[in-house]
Amino acid sequence: MCGVVSFHGLLGSPGNTHGASIKAKILALHGFDDPMVPVEHVIAFAQEMTQAKADWQLHTYGHTMHAFTNPVANNPQFGTVYQPDADRRSWLSMQNFLAELFV
């Protein structure tokens, strides 16, 4: 595997990467207002990727909750809301990431 993309992932550590290096390039696309991912998890993700010597990126979209790429997501109380700007931007980010992988 040469690359991985996460759209509104939970970013929690699986707890099995200590001491291992991550060879795949990583792109995480995240909504800043996602109530399912506490800021501590974002920081822990960054630390874990750095410790594993991964080639990683984290793109964070402001005013954006969980499920921002799902056009039928419309439940702000649950924290899942479609955000068309973040959807479009994250799709472009993924396309650029994949283009870099397969040059």
PLM regions and their residue ranges:
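Acidic catalytic loop of the alpha/beta-hydrolase fold
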Residues: D33-V37, H66
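Structural recognition of the beta-strand scaffold that forms the well-ordered cores
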Residues: G3-S6, L27-A28, L58-T60
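Short alpha-helix in the alpha/beta-hydrolase fold that links the catalytic acid
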Residues: P38-E48, Q57
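Primarily recognizes the serine-hydrolase "nucleophile elbow" in alpha/beta-hydrolase
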Residues: M1-K23
